Each structure stands twice: as C-alpha cells, then as structure tokens.
C-alpha cells in the first residue's frame, strides 16, 4: 500500500474510533452517572471541543495520542469509583433520582458537569490530534471523505451492537482493537519524514512506520485494564438499546431498575396500585379493544385481561423490557392469545395504525432517558403534546376514552396534562390526584366521560412498592389554565414554563469559558495569536460548524416525529446525515461550486419551507408518499450545507486546523440548542439560516474575492 493509502486508512480508522467512542460514552456514562441521562448533550459538547482542540494542535510536535490510553483509563476509573447521584435543586423542572442515596455520593450538578466536560474533552483531544495529523497529509477532499466514511462506519458498528444488545465490554473492545494499529504506528506531523531503520536506512515496506517501545506496551496494558474494569461494572446487567437494565427480587416483587433507577416492579395484579383497574371500575367491563402505550412488563395488560377485553395491543419501545415481562410477570399477560405485543415507539404507532379503540391507556410513561445524544428531548416527550393527544382522539371509537395515570410529582405537571387534554379534545378532562403520594393522578378524557354520571368512590389506600401504606385521600383537580400545554414545537413536558434553568445556565457558562480558554491556549501554541483577523482562525468554518450542528439536531427531531423515537431511528438519522455529507462531498469532487451565495440562497429557501411545513402539516393517504416527501424536506438542506462545507474544505490550506475550527463551531451550536427551551424548535431554523448566511459572507471576506473552486479528487 502506498504512503497516501496508509494515511487514508489511518484517517478512516482514527475517525471510526472517535465516533465509536463518542457514542459509546454517551450511552455508557449515564448508566452510572444518573444526571447524564438528561444531560448527555454535555458529553457530545465535550467531545466536539476535544476534537476541535486536537485538530488545531495537529501541526505541533507534541504527541497527545500517547496519552489516550491513560486518559481513557482515568475516565473509566472515575466513573467506577465515583458513581455519582446528582442533586438538582429546582421545582421548575423534574428529574428522577435513584432513591439510593446510601450507595452514591451526592454532589451539586453544576460543579460536576464541568469537571466531566474537561475530562472527556481531554480524552478526545488525544484522539483528534492523531486524526488531524493523518488528515493533514492528504488532499483536503480525500481527507474529509475518509473522515466521513470512518464516522459513518462508527455509527453503523455501534448500531449493530445495540441491535444485538451487546454489553459495553464489546463496545470498548472494538475501540481497543481500532486503537491498536494507531498505537503501533508513528504519530508525527504530516510534514515530518517517514520513519527509518537503523543507520538512517528506510524500513521495509511492511514495517515502515511501526513503533514498538516500552510506552506502547504500557499503553496496551492500560487499554486492557480499562476493558477489564468495564466488564466488571457491566456484570449482571442487561444492556438494552436504551438502558442498563438490572433485575432483583425484593419480597414478592420482581424489581426492574434502569440506569440504577427504579423503573417498574412485577407482582400479582392484586398487590398493585388501584389505578391499573380504575378505567374498569369507572366504566365497568365494557371495553372490547384496548391500546396500552408503554406497556412495560405487562401489569396494565393483565388488568385489561382480567376485565374481559377481547383484544389488547400492547406497545413497548424496549425489547428487553418485553422479554422480562414475558418471562417474569406472574400474571403472564403476554402469553394470552388476546394480546398483540408491538415493539415500537408509542407516538409512531399512534400515527400509523388504522385501528380504533374503546380505551387508550398511557401506562406510567417515564422513559428516564433522552431521545438521542443530539437533543435535549426526553424519549417520551412527544407522547404528551397536544398533537399526540389529538392522534389519540382520532384513534378512539365514538364512545372511547383516554386514561393517563402516573406519579406526576408536581401540581403544575398535572395542570399541563389537563390543559393539553382540554386543547386536544375540546372539553374538560376529569382528573383526580393524591397529593401525599407524589401527586399520583388519573386523567380521563374523551366522549365516554358523558356516561360517567355516578363515578365510583376513589380509594384512599394506594398500595405501591416500597411506599407508605398510610391512607392518602384523593381530590378532584381543578386545572390552572395558565400552564402552557406541551406541543411538538415545544415538547418540554417536565419544565414549568419557557426558560433556561439556572443550573443549565451556570454549567453552560462554565463550559463556554473553559472552551474559550482552551481555544486561546491552542492558538497561542500554534503561534498565531488570538486577535480578530488572525490567520489561524476562520469564521467561515466556525459558522458552518454551528449551523450544521443545529441543522443535524433539527433533522433528528423531525426524524423522531415522523418515524418514532427508537434507537434505530436515531441511528439511521445520524447515519443519513453523514451519508448526505458524503454525497455532497462526491458532488464537489466532480463539479466546482462557483456560486456559494446561490447554494446558500437555496439552503435558506429550504429552511423557510421547513419552517412553514412542520412534520404532519401535509398529510398523505400513502405512508410511502408521506415518508418520501418529509425525507426530502428534511435532507435537502443537509445536502446544501454539505456542498458549502465541501467546497470550503477543498480550498483549505490547513485542513486539520479548519476542521478543528468547524468542530468548535459545532460545539457552540450544541450550546445554542438550549435556546429551544425558550423559543421552541422551529425558531432554531432562523438561527441556522443566519449561521449559513454569515459563513458565506465570511468566505468572501476571508478570500477577498469570489472565485471558482476546482477540485481534483
């Protein structure tokens, strides 16, 4: 293999390792550090900062990659020794804690998150410097193509491992194997000569660049030790595509925990809370067809079967929870021939099914995790929007009813759901709550409420796993209409109102300060200063990165609305974005981009179309036609963005530096996503458009003249 061929292979391998490890950490760390299930975006931002800094430092003589095994071992050891439960002192948003304070160290989130941010950023800086050096030794477009291909391979590999439900030992084992060839080859700036043998003679082709030193041996041992520690931590757990799942027996209950938090318990129906059977207590055994969303291990299904329903569709997103329900639920509901178990996202099923139901149950829907690493939306957020409740209304029979029950924890959350139901159904829902039981509430809405002329007495006793048996009288709930319902544009169910929580503000401010200082330090190491107009900085690449990160986030959210919030959809969405970037790169390699302003104008026009045509606005009789229409709507801006970046990188005289600046911009774009907590997601389209307009303006300013870009691939 030629020198360029070897460098191309190492670029691919380094890019593969970077993205594989990035997604692996985003999945693995929240399984032990609880709050990261809701703040996984911080790991993503840290990785972008580290990759950006590492690429900026690619031309320097320092060899950061030699520290990669040690830093990775430190990250894994820190998670092992300090499995932290974070307290978030706020009533303005809801986070779920494990209730196992005796087993964890309590720390304040705004102090720990920046520490984790720095450690993870340092890890990716060691990797990215090596990746940047390999890219710098190649023609710009070939380097970027290899980078995209390696990244795509990383996404696909972890997706396959998730599909197979393989444990983290395998994830990190694949990363270990990918790191070995890089550890055993020379790590040097592209401008330095190839490694030589004794007395200055060139090495044989097969051994050229191969390095074997005591340090390499130590690093291999560190990687092996890290792998052993990961294996020890994963022992006894089931790794579903969404969580670390553990099962234990506590008295008569089989308890399921996900990411160290109580998720559900399995016990005979007679020992469970009354609300499972409340719809049948209120309306009698009059339901024929029932839909249960988030069916879990099957208790809600068992209740429906006890009361004589003819058919139950049980929808559950997590295949491992379904298996546990089949094997361990003492009532064996999933073995009943009247039950159809559907492994799907509940909102996607609502949008795509044509069946009608007498009863739709939202069964204790709490995901305890995020939709994807690229957004702050929780997995279940789109189930509790006005649009989702409208989907339920359309799936009800003329005398059907929706029932929602849960431990809502705050009064304002009950108000939000009641207001959402009122907006979707056009009539008042019926809601009762037990304030002394974490606002346990039952909400009913739909035309069958008109039949409830003499409702039964609500039980005072709430029998629940690991809770007090003291009486807790219920009261009817009068909703506060001032609490805003959640919508597909603003789906933040667990936030009282539109604001950026203070703990986010503090943590993000620290993150931005750390990032700014890191960039300044990196630029000074390069000897290029930090003042505006410095030759070492490109606002074009920075704005392209910020815009693309926001565009990717928007696209993944649109994907979830259209095809569901499953891990498959999230993986396909990320892979599709990378594929579109590869397609754009191929186009640029074959045809010059002579009018970047024209491409930007088309991009802005497509963004405007995305703004005025949200997912679901245009309906089709054919699901295939709907999918094609919205796929084109979502992906066409990404193609234009890829053309702009591809044409810019083709003209770069320092590809690793400009790619690093681009990743730093992406990190800032990730911070900008938190604006959606105030504005909603549609408003981000305006920010994306401004980023790309600014990038094209910066391109003209930085080059001094608009010129045709000709690329020889």
Label the predicted regions.
Residues 1-713:
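Alpha-helical transmembrane segments of multi-pass membrane proteins
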């Amino acid at each position: 293999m030629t020198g360029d061929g070897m460098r191309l292979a190492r670029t691919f391998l380094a890019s593969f390792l970077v993205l594989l490890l990035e997604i692996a950490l985003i999945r693995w760390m929240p399984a032990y550090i609880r709050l990261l299930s809701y703040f996984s975006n911080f790991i993503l931002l840290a990785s972008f900062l580290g990759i950006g800094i590492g690429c900026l430092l690619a031309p320097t003589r320092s060899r950061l990659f030699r520290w990669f095994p040690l830093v990775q071992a430190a990250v894994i050891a820190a998670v092992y020794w300090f499995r932290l439960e974070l307290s978030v002192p706020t009533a303005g948003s809801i986070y779920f804690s494990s209730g196992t304070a005796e087993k964890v160290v309590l720390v304040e989130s705004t102090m720990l998150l920046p520490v984790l941010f720095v450690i993870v950023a340092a890890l990716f800086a060691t990797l990215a410097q090596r990746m940047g050096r390999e890219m710098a030794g190649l023609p710009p477009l070939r380097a970027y193509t290899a980078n995209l291909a390696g990244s795509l391979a990383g996404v696909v590999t972890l997706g396959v491992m998730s599909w197979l439900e393989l444990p983290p030992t395998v994830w990190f084992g694949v990363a270990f194997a990918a790191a070995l060839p890089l550890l055993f080859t020379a790590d040097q700036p592209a401008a330095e000569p190839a490694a030589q043998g004794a007395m200055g003679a060139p090495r044989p082709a097969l051994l050229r660049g191969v390095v074997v030193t005591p340090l390499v041996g130590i690093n291999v041992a560190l990687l092996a030790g890290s792998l052993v520690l990961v294996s020890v931590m994963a022992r006894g757990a089931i790794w579903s595509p969404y969580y670390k799942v553990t099962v234990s027996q506590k008295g008569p209950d089989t308890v399921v925990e996900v990411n160290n938090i109580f998720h559900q318990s399995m016990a005979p129906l007679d020992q469970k809370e009354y609300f499972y059977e409340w719809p049948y207590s209120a309306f009698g055994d009059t339901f024929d067809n029932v839909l249960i969303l988030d069916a879990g291990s099957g208790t809600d299904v068992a209740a429906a079967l006890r009361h004589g329903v003819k058919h139950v569709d049980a929808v559950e997103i997590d295949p491992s929870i379904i298996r546990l329900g089949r094997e361990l639920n003492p009532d064996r509901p999933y073995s009943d021939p009247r039950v159809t178990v559907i492994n799907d996202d509940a909102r996607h099923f609502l949008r795509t099914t044509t069946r009608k139901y007498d009863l739709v149950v939202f069964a204790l829907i709490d995901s305890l995790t995020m939709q994807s690493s690229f957004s702050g939306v929780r997995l279940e957020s789109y189930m509790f929007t006005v649009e989702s409740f409208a989907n339920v209304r359309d799936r009800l029979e003329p005398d059907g009813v929706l029932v929602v029950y849960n431990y809502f924890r705050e009064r304002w959350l009950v108000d939000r759901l009641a207001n959402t139901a009122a907006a979707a159904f056009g009539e008042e829902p019926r809601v009762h709550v037990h304030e002394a039981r974490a606002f346990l509430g039952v909400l009913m809405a739909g035309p069958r409420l008109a039949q409830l002329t003499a409702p039964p007495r609500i039980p005072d006793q709430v029998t629940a796993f690991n809770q007090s048996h003291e009486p807790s009288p219920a009261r009817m709930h009068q909703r506060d209409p001032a609490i805003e319902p959640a919508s597909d544009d603003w789906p933040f169910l667990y936030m009282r109102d539109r604001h950026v929580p203070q703990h986010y503000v503090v943590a993000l401010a620290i993150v931005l300060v750390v990032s700014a200082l890191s960039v300044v330090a990196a630029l000074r190491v390069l000897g290029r200063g930090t003042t505006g107009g410095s030759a070492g900085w490109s606002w074009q690449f920075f704005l392209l990165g910020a815009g693309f990160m926001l565009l990717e986030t928007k696209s993944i959210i649109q994907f979830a609305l259209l095809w569901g919030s499953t891990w498959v959809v999230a993986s396909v969405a990320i892979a599709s974005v990378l594929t579109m970037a590869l397609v754009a790169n191929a186009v640029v390699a074959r045809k010059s981009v002579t009018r970047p302003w024209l491409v930007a104008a088309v991009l802005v026009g497509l963004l405007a179309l995305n703004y005025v045509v949200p997912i679901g606005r245009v309906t089709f009789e054919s699901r295939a036609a709907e999918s094609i229409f919205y796929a084109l709507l979502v992906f066409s801006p990404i193609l234009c963005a890829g053309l702009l970046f591809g044409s810019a990188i083709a003209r770069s005289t320092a590809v690793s530096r400009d790619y690093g600046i681009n990743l730093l911009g992406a990190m800032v774009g990730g911070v900008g996503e938190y604006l959606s907590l105030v504005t909603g997601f549609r408003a981000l389209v305006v920010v994306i458009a401004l980023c790309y307009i600014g990038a094209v303006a910066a391109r003209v300013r930085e080059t001094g003249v608009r010129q045709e870009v000709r690329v020889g691939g």
